[in-house]
């Protein structure tokens, strides 16, 4: 089995990353396919994410999953809160019995820089030095520090968006990341502003070789 990473946050909340090496039939033997997905690889990612839910909590009722108008999957009776993310040959999921959760994984690439102005506000761009130039990392010439840094920031905002689950979020205006030093793993303080409320959120992140992961679990 290709479990790439698992972190049991506590008895009620677990997350994992699955490295997809199995054929589609492996997942179909255990996971019902709820919706028609024509693209073979996207279908494989979808099945791997559903499979991972049951791997983390064997009694997870994935046959009860429904999709909200915002495209967020959820359980109507909220026996579990969960969030799923896919990229490349990876699927990630976080599941909790008690708290709302969000997760995102991404492969670090230069494309994130091209859209950084859309998801980072002025203060964030100034603090993380992404206002028009790449950060210089002489120790890594193949993949600059800034590729990884920007991917962590993007994942953080995506994880908050998935935690919220109600759509209609402006990443630069509604999600504010507090300054922090980006390392291989750590925590991120964020403020989420919606519905005339400010939510103080604590996210965690981990940077693997060629993969960034960010997650959060918090009561709404």
Where are these regions (language model features)?
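Core catalytic alpha/beta fold that binds nucleotide/phospho-ligands
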Residues: 1-220
